[in-house]
Curated annotation (Swiss-Prot):
Classification via InterPro entries: HMG_box_dom, HMG_box_dom_sf, HMGB
GO cellular component: chromosome; nucleus
Protein name stated in the entry: Non-histone chromosomal protein 6
A GO term for molecular function: DNA binding
Biased composition annotated in UniProt, kind: Basic residues: 8-17
Main location: nucleus
Positions with biased composition (Basic and acidic residues): 68-90
The species this protein was found in: Aspergillus fumigatus (strain ATCC MYA-4609 / CBS 101355 / FGSC A1100 / Af293) (Neosartorya fumigata)
Ranges annotated as DNA-binding: 25-93
Family: Belongs to the NHP6 family.
Pfam families: HMG_box
Keywords, alphabetical: Chromosome, DNA damage, DNA repair, DNA-binding, Nucleus, Transcription, Transcription regulation
Gene this protein is translated from: nhp6
Length: 104
């Protein structure tokens, strides 16, 4: 007769994450994300019935095939969005510091 397996489960402590502030600024998009958002619908129209994963794969292949001059407009958009994020983050952090000083 085989022995019964006895196992004990140990409880692991879950690390509580801080809740994300809904008022926090959204991160800037990368050049690839601007390209993907602009071209996703074109890929779906050209390939009806394509799966979500295949759309991403085709977008990645098209991005890699772009020359530097073709990528430049997307990189400029990404740089502008990064600057927007940094500006919003700075003002958001300044507002957070003011709130902490008032509550102290």
């Amino acid at each position: 007769m085989p022995k019964e397996k006895t196992s004990t489960r140990t409880k692991t402590k879950r690390v509580e994450r801080k809740k994300k502030d809904p008022n926090a600024p959204k991160r800037g998009l990368s050049a690839y994300m601007f390209f993907a958002n602009e071209n996703r619908d074109k890929v779906r129209e050209e390939n009806p019935g394509i799966s979500f994963g295949q759309v991403g794969k085709m977008l990645g292949e098209r991005w890699k095939a772009l020359s530097d001059s073709e990528r430049r407009p997307y990189e400029e958009k990404a740089a502008a969005d990064k600057k927007r994020y940094e500006d919003e983050k700075a003002s958001y952090n300044a507002a957070q510091d003011e709130d902490e000083e008032e509550s102290s």
